[in-house]
Amino acid sequence: SSDSVVVHTYSASCMEKIMTVKENKVLKFDKATMQPFLEKMFTGFFAVIDSEEFGENEYVMKATMRALSVVKEDVVAITELVLNKLTGALGRVCKNPKNPQYNHYLFESIAVLVRSVCSSQPSATTAFESLLFPPFQTILQMEVTEFIPYVFQVLAQLLEFKVDEIGTSYSTIFVPLLTPTLWESKGNVPALTRLLIAYMNKLGPAHPLITPNLMGILGVFQKRLSSKANEIFAFSLIGSILSHPDGYSAVEA
């Protein structure tokens, strides 16, 4: 509630460090300890994050990420509040990305929230998708290059947890994921590979979305295999195909 950015910064930095302290390899401030303070803590963080006056404070966003990492699934009770605030912040930074550290912790906060909530409640992916897809589509359409790897990372997470049909949003972006220019950026390769594997694990090579594009996927595999730095991603990708009962026949065809 202070009007001082310096107070915000040092308070957030202190809290973030406190949340990493361990005793006998166990967090001294675990999720049970944090539970009574969750709503008040996040309300304080987001009062700063929402404010145009205070700017993008990476220390506050890092503390937000750390708190989400510590409380894990206990954040479920205030998921709507946290997700709305994070997507609001995402919408603002998309217009003018200027603080890489802040942006990194923002996306990591979203990723931690997805993992914490959807690992215990897979059906929650629908709520996440409804709020995250609009800014994600904006990022991809506007080619905000510094954000694209993060978008692919979170999309892969959501798809991994998803229990129902993938829907048109995932179907629409699948073919563009095979575009060679996307794979030319080294920063995109790990997240893109994870996302393609998520599709393969979810649908299988015989799925109507996958089968017509299998040659494109194999092209991605061959290109990654030609690079020593990327061959691990190539083997992960081909492994996701061959792990299916119809994987070998699909590749041979």
Predicted segments with their positions:
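Karyopherin-beta/Importin-beta family HEAT-repeat alpha-solenoid scaffold
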Residues: 1-253
